[in-house]
From Swiss-Prot:
SUPFAM superfamilies for the chain: Glu-tRNAGln amidotransferase C subunit
Gene that specifies this protein: gatC
Quaternary structure note: Heterotrimer of A, B and C subunits.
EC number(s) stated in the UniProt entry for this protein: 6.3.5.-
PANTHER family per UniProt: GLUTAMYL-TRNA(GLN) AMIDOTRANSFERASE SUBUNIT C, MITOCHONDRIAL
Record protein name field: Aspartyl/glutamyl-tRNA(Asn/Gln) amidotransferase subunit C
Length: 95
């Protein structure tokens, strides 16, 4: 798979990233290198490899799940640039 400059522009637009025209070639090369690496990973035979969730065998302590509000919503929302009704307010980015 190969990425062209039109695809770089589209990905940048979807990610809401401003990209100058003189950066397109470099980003195209970077994305193509990443995709080439991913394609190499897809070619590996991992049929005999056991799935794992951690590279170090660790057992995590279990605890009962309890729903709380964190007991400090004011402190949490104090860091928000904008809040309404106890929630973070963010700009709409999905069209």
């Amino acid at each position: 798979m190969s990425v062209d400059q039109a695809t770089v522009r589209r990905v940048a637009h979807l990610a809401r990233i401003s990209v100058r025209e003189d950066e397109l070639g470099h980003l195209q090369n970077e994305l193509n290198a990443i995709l080439e690496f991913v394609e190499q990973l897809a070619d590996l035979d991992v049929s005999g490899v056991e799935p794992l969730t951690s590279v170090v065998p660790v057992e995590l302590p279990m605890r009962e799940d309890v729903v709380t509000d964190g007991h400090c919503p004011e402190k949490v929302l104090a860091n928000a640039p904008d809040a309404e009704g106890g929630f973070f307010t963010v700009p709409k980015v999905v069209e």
